[in-house]
């Protein structure tokens, strides 16, 4: 198994090794460095990094499809807030639920089971901040099902992303289909519009970004080796299933001081199944974050 030091070495292996002329080093090929990270890790990496100030970008497999896993919950929380902004939902509306609705990784809904229900806003916060699976399913049902989230993405100009199932089935793309998938480029664009655009009112956008900034599920992923003064707004996704392997995802808006935000979307698939998330898999996205910071001139 590849370790973290090897991944970091792979991330820099293709940096300044080619000379454009006597004494002049060519600019690093950051896409090639992503490819090197993928080769060292042994799985499949999809990544896209966008500088929202210049419009410049780089990526690897950025137009190939990857499973959302729980990264969809950021968009789900945004949809709840957008519907509230439009007056079609009351964020204080309480959705009832019972023990039968609970799934693995449902910490907030399980802790509040005795209440018999939680407000829409609290469920959206739980889905984003701690990736509560029961909360996500309750919200999807209230909004009209997974296709409602797909429709939301279409209104944002995203013709690629789609959601077809509920938790936990949405963590797999059925063979021969494009279900429950997106591409790094498409999701980066959607994330930019939600977080940095006018999809939400200023108050709702501040609420969502507050939840994102409080999210701690990705401490070993994109944000792990960023400069200490960068703010990070992100949502992770993780999938582990025998016969399918493991998935480790993270989508993020990076807010460096004194420069335009970066949007980063990373999806890594390890074909070897493990019951637990492997640090080496998360290190792939850690390397992606470090590479994005280097590219931005940090």
Question: What residue spans do the PLM features occupy?
Answer:
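N-terminal export signals
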Residues: 6-25
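Active-site SXXK
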Residues: 55, 67-95, 264
């Amino acid at each position: 198994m590849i370790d973290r030091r090897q991944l970091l070495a792979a991330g820099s292996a293709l940096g300044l090794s080619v000379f454009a002329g006597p004494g002049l080093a060519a600019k690093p090929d950051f896409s090639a460095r992503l490819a090197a990270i993928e080769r060292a890790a042994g799985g499949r990496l999809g990544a896209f990094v966008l500088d929202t100030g210049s419009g410049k970008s780089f990526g690897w497999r950025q137009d190939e499809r990857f499973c959302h896993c729980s990264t969809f919950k950021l968009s789900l929380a945004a949809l709840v807030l957008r519907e509230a902004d439009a007056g079609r939902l009351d964020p204080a509306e309480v959705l009832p639920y019972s023990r039968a609705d609970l799934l693995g990784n449902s910490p907030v809904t399980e802790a509040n089971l005795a209440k018999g229900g939680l407000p829409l806003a609290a469920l959206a916060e739980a889905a984003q901040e701690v990736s509560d699976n029961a909360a996500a399913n309750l919200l999807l049902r209230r909004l009209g099902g997974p296709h409602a989230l797909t429709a939301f993405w279409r209104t944002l100009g995203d013709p690629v992303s789609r959601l077809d199932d509920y938790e936990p089935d949405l963590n797999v793309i059925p063979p021969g289909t494009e279900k429950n998938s997106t591409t790094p480029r498409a999701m980066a664009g959607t994330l930019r519009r939600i977080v940095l655009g006018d999809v939400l009112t200023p108050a709702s956008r501040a609420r969502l970004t507050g939840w994102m900034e409080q999210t701690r599920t990705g401490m070993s992923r994109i944000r792990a080796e960023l400069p200490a003064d960068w703010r990070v707004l992100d949502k992770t996704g993780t999938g582990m299933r025998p016969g399918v392997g493991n998935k480790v995802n993270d989508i993020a808006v990076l807010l460096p001081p004194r420069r335009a935000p970066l949007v980063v979307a990373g999806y890594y698939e390890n074909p070897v199944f493990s019951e637990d998330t492997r640090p080496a898999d998360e290190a792939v996205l850690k390397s992606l974050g470090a590479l994005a910071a280097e590219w931005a001139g940090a």
